[in-house]
UniProtKB/Swiss-Prot annotation:
One of its GO terms (cellular component) is cytosol. NCBIfam families: nusB (TIGR01951). This is Transcription antitermination protein NusB. Keywords: RNA-binding, Transcription, Transcription antitermination, Transcription regulation. Belongs to the NusB family. Involved in transcription antitermination. Required for transcription of ribosomal RNA (rRNA) genes. Binds specifically to the boxA antiterminator sequence of the ribosomal RNA (rrn) operons. Gene3D superfamilies: NusB-like. The gene is nusB.
Amino acid sequence: MKPAARHRARECAVQALYSWQLSQNDIADVEYQFLAEQDVKDVDVLYFRELLSGVATNSAYLDGLMKPYLSRLLEELGQVEKAVLRIALFELSKRSDVPYKVAINEAIELAKTFGAEDSHKFVNGVLDKAAPVIRPNKK
């Protein structure tokens, strides 16, 4: 699959996870509704589904990975930043085929696209500290 299709899968995953985090609806329902309502012809849909289910299933674990590196309480974190960080931490911890730098760079780009003005700096700061702990032998 082309890198652009993976990038689009991550973009869609941020949007769907944002919806899931706010609604607390079943992740399968969120996925179904998202795919029914969005144009996903240029999206790696399998990867989108993996990100959604992987983040939803492992959200407590992923939150635990980020907590030591947050400058505020998890509950105070914006929903977009939380979704972006969860995706990146899922890729770093569960998808060894995704290069370390790709996971971080994609998260920064997602934060620039969907987050508040300086959220990409915050996301970069958290991942810059967390990534070497999650993947100690990778750079």
